[in-house]
């Protein structure tokens, strides 16, 4: 090995701390950009695909209460592909024999087998509860220490309690998407409402559109038509919610977070470049006398330049 390259490796060894600092700064910057870019591609694509696979509703109508006839009029509205009605109400629940109460949003289905909007994915046990049975959404298990086969106590408005067994666990990626403050969900049949002292009326309508499932303007037009139609028939609409089929409600939030992380990764790369420049400047100042000796014994400018570039390359490879 030529003497000048021996000197390069000797300098690297003598400045181990600076060498490692440069290497780690470059590695962190490149790694962060690679990971964030990969995460962006995976999350942005898979999140939307999995969301769309559950046939999410494009329009959600929250009302004071309606019956099967009103649902039929919604289904027959021009531009509507499908519509389902449910009753949603909240109750305090606890595992039988314990003291801790947890609030759950109860969702009552008319027909679980005919479910075509906001599909439920079975995870454990039965996905179709019978009369006086309940199925929990997966997130509810983080709030209620219960397993399939256990019994839950439900507190009614007058303070009395009713019990129902947990017969299954499902995943619902569509209904609570985008609502950070939503309570965990539990699912019962409409035949259980009288047992829970709830009126056997729907208060939510979930609608999918025939065309333009990714056109939010078209979806809003259909939603406005449905709202006008219901209110003209005497059904007061409290709130409407719109969402596209292939865009998760949290997609913009996730993309914004990933964008911030990407900017931080790029900033790290720029900061590491500044660190490298300062380190090389300090090394050159240390080597002024060495460079003078090299030139004194016949070293050319090109050779000195190659030494410093080689010094930098070795730091980068290390």
Per-region residue spans from a language model:
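Membrane transport/envelope proteins' first extracytoplasmic loop
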Residues: 1, 5-9, 14-270, 315
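Interfacial "coupling" helices/loops that link adjacent transmembrane helices in transporter permeases
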Residues: 13-15, 274-313
């Amino acid at each position: 090995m030529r003497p000048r390259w021996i000197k390069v490796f000797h300098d690297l060894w003598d400045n181990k701390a600076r060498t490692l600092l440069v290497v780690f700064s470059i590695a962190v910057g490149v790694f962060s950009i690679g990971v964030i870019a990969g995460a962006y591609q995976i999350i942005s694509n898979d999140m939307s695909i999995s969301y769309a696979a559950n046939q999410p509703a494009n329009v959600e109508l929250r009302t004071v209460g309606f019956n099967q006839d009103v649902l039929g009029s919604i289904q027959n509205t021009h531009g509507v592909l499908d519509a389902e009605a449910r009753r949603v109400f909240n109750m305090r629940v606890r595992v039988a024999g314990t003291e801790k109460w947890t609030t759950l949003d109860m969702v009552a289905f008319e027909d679980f087998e005919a479910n075509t909007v906001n599909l439920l994915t079975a995870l454990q046990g039965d996905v179709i509860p019978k009369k006086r049975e309940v199925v929990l959404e997966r997130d509810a298990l983080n709030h209620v220490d219960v397993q399939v086969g256990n019994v839950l106590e439900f507190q009614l408005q007058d303070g009395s309690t009713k019990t129902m067994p947990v017969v299954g666990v499902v995943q619902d990626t569509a209904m609570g998407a985008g609502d950070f403050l939503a309570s965990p969900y539990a699912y019962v049949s409409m035949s259980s409402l009288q047992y829970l002292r709830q009126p056997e009326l729907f208060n939510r309508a979930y609608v999918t559109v025939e065309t333009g499932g990714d056109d939010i303007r078209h979806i809003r037009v259909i939603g406005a038509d449905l709202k006008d139609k219901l209110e003209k028939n005497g059904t007061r609409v409290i709130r409407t919610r719109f969402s596209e089929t292939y865009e998760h409600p949290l997609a913009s939030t996730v993309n914004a977070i990933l964008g911030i992380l990407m900017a931080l990764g790029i900033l790290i790369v720029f900061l590491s470049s500044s660190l490298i420049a300062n380190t090389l400047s300090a090394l050159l100042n240390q080597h002024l006398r060495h460079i003078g000796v090299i030139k004194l014994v016949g070293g050319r400018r090109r050779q000195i330049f190659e030494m410093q570039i080689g010094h930098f390359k070795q730091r980068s490879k290390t």
